[in-house]
Amino acid sequence: MKLLITGGAGFIGSSLCEKYVKKGHTVICLDNFLSGSLTNIAHLLDFQNFKLVKGDIRNSDLLDRVVKDVDFIFNLAAQIHVDRSYVEPKLTFDINIMGTQNVLEMARLYDVKKIIHASSSEVYGSAMNVPIDENHP
């Protein structure tokens, strides 16, 4: 199976990349590195079934080339910093809304079998206790 993982150099995205690369799937990791880190995926760069694409989900032309032969998309690309969203609301809108629309449109255009769109912990509000554990209310 050929997978596209947007935001693949982030914390969760890099874990997904590693999981599927080690299972033998072809993985394309797309990240703009605004919050993701090359350190998170450096150990995957030598795998033949792993491809890193430095780019942005706002770039329709790039997505057109990348999504073309993909079976499955994990969309984890987002501007995730709440404080930054107040300072740069247009950037947040462009990435989180317009970028996601681009991913969905390419998935439709190329008849991608499945897409999983991730949210963030911010939808749950502020944590009552830090650090958060598995039993957190």
Segments predicted by a language model, with ranges:
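N-terminal Rossmann-like NAD(P)+-binding domain of SDR-like oxidoreductases, especially those catalyzing
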Residues: 1-137
